[in-house]
């Protein structure tokens, strides 16, 4: 199959080094793009400087290169996109689609992450406040290529959500939607932990007149205690010397054929074979896969 219109992306955060869970996500999005001769973009989501680890940006790029996951075009850094985000936040605020919120974390305790609307009609000034987007009392639903139909009532299950924090930093939901549209992304392949973020992004896309990408949410790799592999749980960083065996293990996590004879192959050779054999329909329709099952 050949679809030169396909544009995918991998968007890591530089809060730490890439780990095995990152590799599975990167590999899935890379293969989905390359299998149809599409483009694969790299975007570093560095919108939260306090959480950024020194040296992580360069390490992420180097690791992807050593694992053979080459991207198209220039790397985009979200920290360079602030003027675009500011313009949209200003427009939404001035149109009454968003409002200033002065609620503290303590005030919101006990609401299970669902904003109760305390500041919705308060008319607070913007200075020193977060900016929340008003959400409709509607159900947003989409069909994921692996997980099937997913739906969420934005008003009841999320509430008005933050698009700019009180410290001035821009929220993930806003930045990801603006950047995917700006880069012309047609297909988003990412971890199932972001499945319930998607309806908020669909609403933003609708509000801003953007087309909706196709979505594919892969199972998360989890540790024995059920936590996903991640920087906050000190998952070991990827080592260049282990590229081939880890790529093969990542293929197994995605339900793909991982020929043991490729253990002596280079990362580029493993990827060339995997690209030809890519079958997204073989990915398990589940949200987690225990890491122990992959050995």
From Swiss-Prot:
Binds 1 zinc ion per subunit. Its cofactor is Zn(2+). ATP binds at residue 231. The keyword Ligase applies. Zn(2+) binds at residues 101, 103, 115, 119. A motif ('KMSKS' region) lies at residues 228-232. It is an enzyme of class 6 (ligase). One of its GO terms (cellular component) is cytosol. L-glutamate binds at residues 9-13, 45, 172, 190. A motif ('HIGH' region) lies at residues 12-22. InterPro entries: Glu-Q_tRNA(Asp)_Synthase (IPR022380), Glu/Gln-tRNA-synth (IPR000924), Glu/Gln-tRNA-synth_Ib_cat-dom (IPR020058), GluQ/Sye (IPR049940), Rossmann-like_a/b/a_fold (IPR014729). One of its GO terms (molecular function) is ATP binding. GO terms for biological process: glutamyl-tRNA aminoacylation; tRNA modification. Its EC number is 6.1.1.-. Keywords: Aminoacyl-tRNA synthetase, ATP-binding, Ligase, Metal-binding, Nucleotide-binding, Zinc. Catalyzes the tRNA-independent activation of glutamate in presence of ATP and the subsequent transfer of glutamate onto a tRNA(Asp). Glutamate is transferred on the 2-amino-5-(4,5-dihydroxy-2-cyclopenten-1-yl) moiety of the queuosine in the wobble position of the QUC anticodon. Belongs to the class-I aminoacyl-tRNA synthetase family. GluQ subfamily. This is Glutamyl-Q tRNA(Asp) synthetase. It comes from Pseudomonas putida (strain W619). The gene is gluQ.
């Amino acid at each position: 199959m050949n679809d030169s219109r396909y544009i995918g992306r991998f968007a890591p955060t530089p809060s730490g080094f890439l780990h095995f869970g990152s590799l599975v996500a990167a590999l899935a999005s890379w293969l989905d793009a390359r299998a149809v001769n599409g483009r694969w973009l790299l975007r570093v989501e560095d919108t939260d400087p306090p959480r950024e680890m020194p040296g992580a940006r360069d390490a992420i790029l180097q690791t992807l290169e050593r694992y053979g996951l080459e991207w198209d075009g220039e790397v985009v850094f979200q920290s360079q996109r602030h003027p675009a985000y500011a313009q949209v936040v200003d427009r939404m605020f001035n149109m009454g689609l968003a409002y200033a919120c002065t609620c503290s974390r303590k005030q919101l305790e006990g609401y299970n992450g669902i904003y109760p609307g305390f500041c919705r009609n308060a008319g607070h000034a913007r200075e020193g406040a977060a900016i929340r987007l008003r959400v409709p009392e509607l159900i947003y639903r989409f069909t994921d290529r692996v997980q099937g139909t997913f739906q969420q009532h934005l008003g009841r299950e999320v509430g008005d959500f933050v698009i700019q924090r009180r410290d001035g930093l821009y929220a993930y939901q806003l930045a990801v939607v603006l950047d995917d549209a700006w880069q012309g992304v047609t297909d988003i392949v990412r971890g199932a932990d972001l499945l319930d973020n998607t309806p908020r992004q669909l609403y933003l896309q609708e509000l801003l007149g953007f087309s909706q990408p196709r979505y594919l949410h892969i199972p998360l790799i989890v540790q024995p205690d059920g936590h996903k592999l991640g920087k906050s749980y000190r998952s070991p960083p990827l080592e260049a010397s282990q590229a081939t065996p880890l790529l093969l293990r990542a293929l197994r996590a995605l339900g793909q054929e991982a020929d043991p004879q490729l253990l002596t192959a280079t990362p580029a050779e493993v990827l060339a074979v995997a690209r030809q054999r890519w079958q997204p329909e073989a990915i398990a329709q589940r949200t987690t896969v225990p890491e122990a099952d992959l050995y």
